């Protein structure tokens, strides 16, 4: 039915053990998975995800090594299918939920990510959903929303102006709701790349590009002095 999908792969490493990988798609019957009872992967007969891998098994000499499974859900009026939960299993085959995605923005970008049931990270997007502009660890979306107010909702669809950039950093880094959070923020030149990154300590790293949009240098400012971290030089093949 879907001859373009990779179903089975065999690897012959140097130690001569036979490693096989099997892939399952929305039109396949999933194997029996220990530790979980739900069987609906959420894609159904979705025509836009025919090549999306739902589960992958890796075996060594036909013995299970690991397995990963993704459940999906619909966002943006259920028109867009995105990961809902990710499960992983070791050689015992018992699936454990390792990642959960409770919230997405209107562009289908993950906004809140929960790992291992307790480690929460919020990722905010802007530039009409094209780029992540903030990563807040050890915080929930509700806490971030309280810190930012209406900016949390308007940020994805806008363009990050200098004024919004200052407000975003100030609110995220000074809010009482985020006193235990680790905040990293990113500013971009659209269609070129990142131009500034501020780490959880409040230190900025800058990125500069040439007229062709290629990364020219990465630097920081220490004591008012520019300190290069990386410098790139581009030449044609025959250019000396």
Describe each PLM feature range.
Residues 1-115, 119-199, 203-240:
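Beta-strand elements of repeat-based all-beta scaffolds
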């Amino acid at each position: 039915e879907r001859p373009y999908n990779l179903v089975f792969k065999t690897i012959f490493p140097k130690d001569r053990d036979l490693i096989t990988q099997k892939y399952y798609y929305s039109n396949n019957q999933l194997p029996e998975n220990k530790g979980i009872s739900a069987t609906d992967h959420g894609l159904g007969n979705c025509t836009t995800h025919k090549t999306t891998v739902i589960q992958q098994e890796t075996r060594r000499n036909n013995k299970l090594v690991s397995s990963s499974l993704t459940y999906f859900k619909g966002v943006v009026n259920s028109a867009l299918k995105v990961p809902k939960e990710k499960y992983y299993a070791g050689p015992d085959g018992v699936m454990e939920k390792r990642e959960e995605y409770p919230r997405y923005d209107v562009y289908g970008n993950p906004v809140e990510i929960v790992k291992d049931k307790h480690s929460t990270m919020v990722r905010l997007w802007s530039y009409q959903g094209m780029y992540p502009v903030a990563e807040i660890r050890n915080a929930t979306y509700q806490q971030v929303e309280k810190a930012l107010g209406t900016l949390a909702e308007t940020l994805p669809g806008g363009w990050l102006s200098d004024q919004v950039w200052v407000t975003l950093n100030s609110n995220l880094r000074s809010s009482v709701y985020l006193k235990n959070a680790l905040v990293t923020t990113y500013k971009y030149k659209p269609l070129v790349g990142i131009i500034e990154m501020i780490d959880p300590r409040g230190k900025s790293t800058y990125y500069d590009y040439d007229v062709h949009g290629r990364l020219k240098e990465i630097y920081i400012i220490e004591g008012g002095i520019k300190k290069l971290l990386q410098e790139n030089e581009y030449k044609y093949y025959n250019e000396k």
